[in-house]
């Protein structure tokens, strides 16, 4: 089972889209969470369904030149039901090889008013019950290992450290439009 989360900063460009397609084929991804599609949700779903017939997709519209979320998954390995939420896309169901129900959240965290955003997410209860995978652009540093020098420590990092979450570090792949060719997180 290979899951990935990728911040594209615009999905419409030909180099990005063709490289993303090669990524799907070469790595045999089972589920991908995309942030910052900068695209209409319905159009991006249709685009992916043409390339990957039989796969399932769910998308949230971009707001002007920012935002836009997409989840795409292989129904042979992921039996998931999508729910569009004010703060992201929630997928609920089962992954091949796991008996327990899993919740997968793809979100794009805000730059401003982050505390009320995370308080709202925490109060809805999905962070506490059962298996949970969160991917996305959090606009937040959640690992204390990432703080250095006189960097201001974000109180939300303490919230995550209190949840007993396991952070998954990046696995490298060559994608030309990203700095140093680093891809989003890949979980195997």
What are these regions, as identified by a protein language model?
Residues 1-188:
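A shared catalytic/ligand-binding motif for oxyanion handling
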């Amino acid at each position: 089972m290979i899951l990935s989360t990728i911040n594209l900063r615009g999905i419409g460009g030909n180099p990005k889209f063709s490289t993303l397609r090669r990524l799907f084929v070469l790595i045999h991804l089972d589920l991908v969470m995309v942030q910052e599609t900068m695209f209409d949700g319905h159009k991006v779903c249709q685009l992916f369904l043409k390339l990957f017939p039989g796969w399932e997709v769910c998308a949230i519209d971009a707001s002007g030149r920012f935002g836009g979320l997409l989840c795409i998954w292989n129904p042979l390995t992921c039996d998931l039901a999508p729910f569009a939420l004010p703060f992201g896309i929630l997928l609920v169901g089962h992954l091949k090889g796991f008996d327990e129900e899993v919740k997968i959240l793809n979100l794009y965290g805000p730059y401003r008013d982050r505390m009320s955003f995370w308080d709202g997410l925490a109060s809805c209860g999905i962070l506490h019950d059962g298996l949970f995978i969160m991917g996305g652009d959090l606009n937040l540093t959640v690992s204390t290992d990432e703080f250095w020098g006189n960097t201001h420590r974000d109180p939300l990092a303490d919230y995550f450290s209190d949840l007993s979450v396991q952070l998954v570090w990046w696995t490298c792949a060559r994608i030309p439009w990203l700095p140093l060719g680093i891809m989003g997180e890949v979980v195997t």
